[in-house]
């Protein structure tokens, strides 16, 4: 208990982060998203639109399509697709994320962007 008290005094709370990957064409980019998400401790990935996704239980895609996409994603993800929880949705579930307390943050580089080092994350954030 004493160690936990000491650690809680020096460690900041880690935000719960969801990554939303919408309309990503390349299976290699999807694999890279999984691999990066695992390295950063991302809580979940939501794949949406025409983004390819690994095999899901109850997958309605033709088996050869599902297996081919899963294999291609695995080549880049290096197994991270089995470690990071994910879901697929045709539409981005923005309303349900907001209702669950997530702040939606769009990632884009422009003259109004905030440097990541200067950004203070809320407790629950969904990166789009």
Task: List each model region and its residues.
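RNA substrate-binding interface of SAM-dependent RNA methyltransferases
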Residues: 4-110
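Charged helix-capping and loop-helix junction motifs
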Residues: 119-122
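Beta-strand/loop substructures that line and gate deep hydrophobic ligand-binding cavities in soluble
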Residues: 125
């Amino acid at each position: 208990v004493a160690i936990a008290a000491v650690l809680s005094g020096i460690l900041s709370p880690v935000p719960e982060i969801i990554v939303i990957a919408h309309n990503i064409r390349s299976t290699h980019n999807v694999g890279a998203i999984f691999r990066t998400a695992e390295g950063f401790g991302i809580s979940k990935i939501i794949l949406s639109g025409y983004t390819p996704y690994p095999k899901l239980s109850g997958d309605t895609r033709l088996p050869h399509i599902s297996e081919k996409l899963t294999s291609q994603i695995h080549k880049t993800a290096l197994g991270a697709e089995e470690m990071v929880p994910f879901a697929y949705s045709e539409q981005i579930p923005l309303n349900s994320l907001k209702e669950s307390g997530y702040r939606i943050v769009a990632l884009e580089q422009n003259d109004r962007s905030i440097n990541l080092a200067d950004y203070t994350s809320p407790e629950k954030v969904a990166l789009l």
